């Protein structure tokens, strides 16, 4: 494994650990998810380019489309929660609370 792949893999791990540790606020969770998607996109693009695997060249674009949809839904959820409750705590999303 080259150093570039290792750094990208470590970026994914750091984003994943951030998602596990800082999950009280919705904005920090969304930022960690975006970091994970960015590192996946870069890793997928570099793997396809280095292996000359042209049949899968559409996969990074599809991943970017899903990342954009995830970001749009996450930000709309953030706006809805912050307008309703005044904060962006993830615990406000629990519908089973009384």
Swiss-Prot record:
Tagged with keyword Transport: yes
Keywords: Electron transport, Membrane, Mitochondrion, Mitochondrion inner membrane, NAD, Respiratory chain, Translocase, Transmembrane, Transmembrane helix, Transport, Ubiquinone
Function: Core subunit of the mitochondrial membrane respiratory chain NADH dehydrogenase (Complex I) which catalyzes electron transfer from NADH through the respiratory chain, using ubiquinone as an electron acceptor. Part of the enzyme membrane arm which is embedded in the lipid bilayer and involved in proton translocation.
Entry GO terms, CC: mitochondrial inner membrane; respiratory chain complex I
Chief localization: mitochondrion
Any one GO molecular function term: NADH dehydrogenase (ubiquinone) activity
Family statement drawn from the similarity comment of this UniProt entry: Belongs to the complex I subunit 4L family.
Compartments in which it is found: Mitochondrion inner membrane
Natural source organism: Arctocephalus pusillus (Cape fur seal)
Protein name: NADH-ubiquinone oxidoreductase chain 4L
Subunit-structure text: Core subunit of respiratory chain NADH dehydrogenase (Complex I) which is composed of 45 different subunits.
